[in-house]
Amino acid sequence: MEDINRLLQIRKTVLQMLSDREYIITAYEQEYPRESFVSRENLTMYCVKKDDPTDSIYVFFPDTPKVGVTQIKKYVDIMKDRQANRAIIVVQQNITPFAKQALAEFSQEKKITLEQFNEAELLVNITHHQLVPKHILLTKEEKLELLTRYKMKESQLPRIQTNDPVARYYGLSRGHVVKIVRPSETAGRYITYRLCV
């Protein structure tokens, strides 16, 4: 029972993450029946982006505590069948070193993005914490407008690492610019921009 409650919380955080990344969440995904939590594989989700139906994502929940290369290959084949270019793998414990290497190879060769999150990382939605400011991913047009307005180069922007927890939550990759809105006692709100490196 405790395991089901844990999975419910993880699934809720994943749905919030997909929604924040602007993927369409169906009513079925939101009201997923509790009885279906028998197997983690049943929790697999497929979503498409609101403004671009060709941009799709899979979320996999492997049954085994440690994920190996064979499972990674299986997930890549599933992605190829639906022409998905991005996936999130939610692992119970860890991913084997060979599987990590396979993740990197598939990402380079097949032009797909495979992200890995531990279940413990998804028990709490970090963006809902009071100390984490609001992050907004800028489009290419908004990024160009920002650089021309302030007459600066991309390299002059402050940086955020790709392995930063919030950057991972939003699925940022190199070159993305994020707008960070913080509350300020003197100015009302304080806006900064960061380049993902």
Curated annotation (Swiss-Prot):
GO MF annotations in UniProt: DNA binding; DNA-directed RNA polymerase activity
Transcription among keywords: yes
UniProt main location, coarse: nucleus
GO CC terms in record: RNA polymerase I complex; RNA polymerase II, core complex; RNA polymerase III complex
Location in or out of the cell: Nucleus
Pfam families for this protein: RNA_pol_Rpb5_C, RNA_pol_Rpb5_N
One Gene Ontology term from the biological process aspect of the record: transcription elongation by RNA polymerase I
Keywords: DNA-directed RNA polymerase, Nucleus, Transcription
Source species, domain of life: Eukaryota
Gene3D superfamilies in alphabetical order: RNA polymerase, Rpb5, N-terminal domain (3.40.1340.10), RPB5-like RNA polymerase subunit (3.90.940.20)
Signal peptide: none
Subunit structure: Component of the RNA polymerase I (Pol I), RNA polymerase II (Pol II) and RNA polymerase III (Pol III) complexes consisting of at least 13, 12 and 17 subunits, respectively. In RNA Pol II, this subunit is present in 2-fold molar excess over the other subunits.
HAMAP family: RNApol_Rpo5_RPB5
Similarity comment: Belongs to the archaeal Rpo5/eukaryotic RPB5 RNA polymerase subunit family.
NCBIfam families referenced in this protein's UniProt entry, alphabetically: PRK09570.1
Known role: DNA-dependent RNA polymerase catalyzes the transcription of DNA into RNA using the four ribonucleoside triphosphates as substrates. Common component of RNA polymerases I, II and III which synthesize ribosomal RNA precursors, mRNA precursors and many functional non-coding RNAs, and small RNAs, such as 5S rRNA and tRNAs, respectively. Pol II is the central component of the basal RNA polymerase II transcription machinery. Pols are composed of mobile elements that move relative to each other.
Record protein name field: DNA-directed RNA polymerases I, II, and III subunit rpabc1
Gene giving rise to this polypeptide: polr2e
